[in-house]
Amino acid sequence: MRSRVILIALILGLSTLPASQAGEPEDLDEVGFVFGGVHIESSMSGNSTSNLSDLPAIVEDYTATWCTNCVKVEHALDDVEETNNMQQYHFHRFIGENEDPLGSQEGDERWIDRYEQRLPPTVVFNGTLRQIGSVPSGDSLQGDYDTNLQNALSLGQGTSTLGWVAATNNSSAIATWNLVFDTSLIPEDATIKSSIWVVEHLAHFPDGGNQEEYYHESVRGIIELGDSMSGSMEVTLPTAYDGDDLEVHLIHE
């Protein structure tokens, strides 16, 4: 009986450890791709549009302010961003979290729904390729990530457009969106859902266990827009952790 208790304790302990082992990039065949990235500062009214062929690769990083292994991963992402068309989104751990103030309930719920495991550090490229941990599969994380980014999406011809009317003292913000996309490129029974990812450009949090202090491109909230290719919606934004540098990003998946 005692050996069984010890085994269970070991399993539970291992399941809660941040992943730092080497991990081969893993194809995610069942969850569908993620694309988009046109964005606007939330305090400014305007619009942004892009051809699908010009959109950046969407790189999702699951992280936490106490995660020391995450620092190596994020520095590697910064390095490869210098030579690749990509946009980073940092999803901070929220559910069951008492040390990291930068995550959101809906961010964690989406991560669980798509990717199941909430193991910082985890990086997902275009929703289709996941690499867990901070030890490289090859010679370096930079080399791994650069290779992962070569698996570009084939989105065909089309455009993604975001319009934004900033909130005033008397009215809520309004988001409009339009996606021109060849739906023959997705399975017959599939749909494309759009959402606004509310991103804090830079947050200062000096109390994180990883000693980073400044955290970039943190996803502070997700606002679902549904599966219509175009529309308009009043939007209430979450509060920035500090400053006034929230951005609204249009994402499709």
Predicted regions and their residues:
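C-type cytochrome heme c attachment motif
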Residues: 65-72, 121-122
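Extracytoplasmic/secreted envelope proteins and their assembly/folding machinery
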Residues: 59, 73-78, 108, 120
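N-terminal carbohydrate-binding/catalytic regions of secreted carbohydrate-active enzymes
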Residues: 64, 77-81, 91, 111-114
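Second-shell loop/turn segments in exported
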Residues: 60-66, 131-136
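Secretory targeting signatures
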Residues: 1-50, 54-59, 67-68, 76
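Thiol-based oxidoreductase modules, predominantly thioredoxin-like and allied folds used
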Residues: 83-106
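Structural recognition of the beta-strand scaffold that forms the well-ordered cores
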Residues: 58-61, 87-92, 121-125
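Short, conserved sequence motifs used for protein processing/export or organelle targeting and
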Residues: 100-118, 122-125, 129, 136-253
